[in-house]
UniProtKB/Swiss-Prot annotation:
The keyword Chloroplast does not apply. NAD-binding protein involved in the addition of a carboxymethylaminomethyl (cmnm) group at the wobble position (U34) of certain tRNAs, forming tRNA-cmnm(5)s(2)U34. It comes from the Bacteria. The keyword NAD applies. GO terms for biological process: tRNA methylation; tRNA wobble uridine modification. It comes from Rickettsia prowazekii (strain Madrid E). It holds the Pfam family SAM_GIDA_C. This is tRNA uridine 5-carboxymethylaminomethyl modification enzyme MnmG. InterPro entries: FAD/NAD-bd_sf (IPR036188), GIDA_C_N (IPR049312), MnmG (IPR004416), MnmG-rel (IPR002218), MnmG-rel_CS (IPR020595), MnmG_C (IPR026904), MnmG_C_subdom (IPR047001), MnmG_C_subdom_sf (IPR044920).
Length: 621
């Protein structure tokens, strides 16, 4: 009888990372997806990264995940977002050649050790004594396994909406999964509906680019993956246009025909990626909205007009596009649509992403209420790691808010749940100064090495980089100038007669790496990424010291367990409202309790005192 350690259902961004992570840990893994071209499919925009999202990609790469490496082999337009602000909120982003991205992903996965791929449809999951036993395919056959990672994306009872037209689909032209939705309902999971959308696709050959604004990428693309030296994929430009008053009039006149505004859609859409209908209604005083014209490939004339996601009827979509500068004669290749799908309340899962109800069943991606390729991939790699570690009877791998954006996301989901598609932002992290894109590998790769999910190749790269960091730091500490000489160069420092090292100078707000290289040309030979890392660490040194103290407090509270049988109503010094909230959420630690909305610092102090008195008294009896 064929049996796998881990089976992953779904070959999207969560699924491929889960499958690869499980396989890297040496567990016999099966990835089941409908067809080969589904592997790593970019269902919506052809891009990876962005503000906070780019940091997620770097964290996935730090754990030897695939996304960063694959985008570096298929990225056609790189841009660092937010670069005029501090490094803590920089957002690496790259447009992808959609077909090339899938091709590279397919090549990697089909040659991955310990990984089999089956093109089939899963209809059900066989459970015995609240434990995963097998998956059941549409042809009735069973494949037995120890663990299942469910990464279904928008396919759970998915419905596409284009105006009044409503059709069952998990993605346009692809059938949804009713079987697995029924499985989850039968097992008693709390299920609700969410919605997302995508814009129409346009034939780039029919666009008048002279009426648009050119958007160039970075002159020197900065790779996502630590395994990538340089980006050798040809780079191309994007373009920007905008809606007009005529566009807005057409949308307002046809709002009753929009699936969103006619009451046809029940699910809540993503707050930070609204449809064009939402923009016109909620920002009614705004005269125009920007539209980014993003090429879908080097040899593909399809253009993705980022900013006009819609569920309006096809004929209305055609009409409104004609009112946009540069698109007056544009040909629509495919209409935009909204898609509604099932998701499970993420409070039904643990921080390992294993469900609380069923042992061996893990959820990752949009099934947990998130939106975005990067959020899905971040969950996928954690689910795959933990499923494989469980097969091997090893301790789970848990990332916290203090170590990663992935940890922030999982903690938010499992603690608070979500009623709208969850998207990662830098503002969600209280430790974002230390959780930057540039130091993701320094935060996570060592942790990955300890559990065995890092390949030997990356381990060598990482070890070499760490040595180079120490050598470069030593060099920067040895290169110094007197304050008088610095003053002659126009660099303002306190004239105390002391020598100032390059690391000292990095703390000056106006001083940067380029100036350091100009003063000491020997630095040209050093790795620029390492120089930038040390520059940022020096620049933020005083702030980071305070943040590390906060992190130490956080970590101490994270390990301060709250007994499962605690009765909050017996703590007289906290209000009834807080007692009810704590009883409902059942936080496992003091740290989790503190993060629940409405829980005051005074109530946390009261709980700590109560635990010390009650449980120390009981232990002394």
């Amino acid at each position: 009888m064929l049996k796998y350690g881990v089976i992953i259902i779904g070959g999207g961004h969560a699924g491929v990372e889960a499958a690869a992570a499980s396989a890297r840990l040496g567990v016999h893994t099966l990835l089941i997806t409908l067809k080969p071209e589904n592997l790593g499919e970019m269902s919506c925009n052809p891009a990876i990264g962005g503000i906070a999202k780019g940091t997620l990609v770097k964290e996935i790469d730090a754990l030897d995940g695939l996304m960063g490496f694959v985008i570096d082999k298929s990225g056609i337009h790189y841009k660092m977002l937010n670069e005029t602000r501090g490094p803590a909120v920089w957002g690496p982003r790259a447009q992808a050649d959609r077909k090339l991205y899938k091709k590279v992903m397919y090549q990697i996965l089909t040659n991955y050790r310990n990984l089999d791929i089956l093109y089939a449809k899963v209809e059900d999951i066989q459970i015995k004594s609240s434990k995963v036993e097998a998956v059941i395919l549409s042809n009735g056959s069973k494949i037995f396994c120890q663990k299942v990672v469910l990464t279904t994306g928008t396919f759970l009872s998915g419905f596409i909406h284009i105006g009044s037209i409503k059709m069952p689909a998990g993605r346009i032209y692809e059938e949804p999964s009713y079987g697995l939705s029924n499985t989850l309902k039968r097992l008693g999971f709390k299920i609700a509906r969410l919605k997302t959308g995508t814009p129409p696709r346009i034939d780039g050959r029919t666009i008048d680019y002279s009426k648009t604004a050119l958007q160039q990428g970075d002159q020197i693309p900065r790779p996502f993956s630590e395994l990538t030296d340089v980006i050798d994929v040809p780079q191309i430009n994007c373009f920007i246009t905008k809606t007009t008053s005529e566009t807005h009039d057409i949308i307002r006149e046809n709002l009753d025909k929009s699936a969103m505004y006619s009451g046809q859609i029940e699910g809540i859409g993503p707050r930070y990626c609204p449809s064009i209908e939402d923009k016109i209604v909620k920002f009614s005083t705004k005269l125009e909205h920007r539209i980014f014209l993003e090429p879908e490939g080097l040899e593909d004339y399809t253009i993705y007009p980022n900013g006009i996601s819609t569920s309006l009827p096809e004929e209305v979509q055609y009409k409104l596009i004609k009112t946009i500068p540069g698109l007056e004669n544009a040909q629509v290749l495919r209409p935009g649509y909204a898609i509604e799908y099932d998701y499970v309340d993420p409070r039904e899962i643990n921080v390992t992403l294993e469900t609380k109800k069923i042992t061996g069943l893990y959820f990752a991606g949009q099934i947990n209420g998130t939106t975005g390729y990067e959020e899905a991939a971040g969950q996928g790699i954690i689910a795959g790691i933990n499923a494989a570690l469980s097969v091997k009877d090893q301790a789970p791998f848990i990332l916290t808010r203090a170590t990663s954006y992935i940890g922030v996301m999982i903690d938010d989901l499992t603690t608070f749940g979500t009623v709208e598609p969850y998207r990662m932002f830098t503002s969600r992290s209280e430790y974002r100064l230390s959780l930057r894109a540039d130091n993701a590998d320094l935060r996570l790769t060592e942790l990955g090495i300890k559990i065995g999910v890092i390949t030997e190749k990356r381990k060598k790269f990482f070890t070499k980089k760490c040595k180079n960091i120490e050598k470069t730091k030593l060099l920067l500490n040895n290169l110094s100038l007197t304050t008088s000489k610095l003053a002659k160069m126009g660099i303002q420092v306190a004239q105390d007669g002391k020598y100032k090292t390059i690391l000292d100078l990095f703390k000056i707000p106006s001083f940067n790496v380029e100036q350091a290289i100009k003063i000491f040309p020997i630095l040209k030979k050093q790795n620029n990424n390492i120089l930038q890392l040390l520059y940022i660490e020096a620049k933020y040194a005083s702030y980071l010291t305070r943040q590390y103290a906060d992190i130490n407090l956080f970590q101490s509270e994270e390990i301060q367990l709250i007994p499962k049988n605690i009765d909050y109503f017996k703590i007289p010094s906290i209000s009834l409202e807080i007692q009810e909230k704590l009883s409902y959420h059942k936080p496992a630690t003091i740290g989790v309790a503190r993060r629940i909305s409405g829980i005051t610092p005074a109530s946390i102090t009261a709980i700590i005192i109560y635990l010390k008195t009650k449980y120390s008294d009981e232990s002394s009896k």
